[in-house]
């Protein structure tokens, strides 16, 4: 009994090498397209570090133009409150446990802006779990 390979059972080396080349090209090009297609907020969320390294000691609530609450998660173990001030272009990190900041958040919860309410609710929920 002899074992002979049929010609149809063999894989030509030319198609195998082109298949390997195609697989490597796809492997290296897919992550680049995925990173370019992701929105900016998704890329920020994938950074595994805290945004707020230092906290502002005090701030006038009338100077706050926008308030963003980032709940605790895999990127940072603590809740972060970031305020955009009316007279500055930089963001300021605030202490989420400060009584004044809690009052500002409660005032925002009473407002009509749904997105702002959602951010403030995330802060209240995460603060109650800590």
UniProtKB/Swiss-Prot annotation:
Annotated GO biological process: animal organ regeneration; antimicrobial humoral immune response mediated by antimicrobial peptide; cellular response to lipopolysaccharide; inflammatory response; leukocyte homeostasis; midbrain development; neutrophil activation; neutrophil chemotaxis
Subcellular location(s) of the protein: Secreted
Signal as UniProt keyword: yes
UniProt-listed Gene3D superfamilies: 2.40.50.40
Principal localisation: secreted
SMART domains: SCY
Disulfide bonds: 50-76, 52-93
GO CC aspect terms: extracellular space
Record flagged with keyword Signal: yes
Signal peptide positions on this chain: 1-37
Recorded GO MF terms: chemokine activity; CXCR chemokine receptor binding
InterPro entries named in the record: Chemokine_b/g/d (IPR039809), Chemokine_CXC (IPR001089), Chemokine_CXC_CS (IPR018048), Chemokine_IL8-like_dom (IPR001811), CXC_Chemokine_domain (IPR033899), Interleukin_8-like_sf (IPR036048)
Keywords: Cytokine, Disulfide bond, Secreted, Signal
Function (record text): May participate in the recruitment of inflammatory cells by injured or infected tissue.
Entry's family note: Belongs to the intercrine alpha (chemokine CxC) family.
Subunit structure, interactors included: Monomer. Homodimer.
Protein name: C-X-C motif chemokine 5
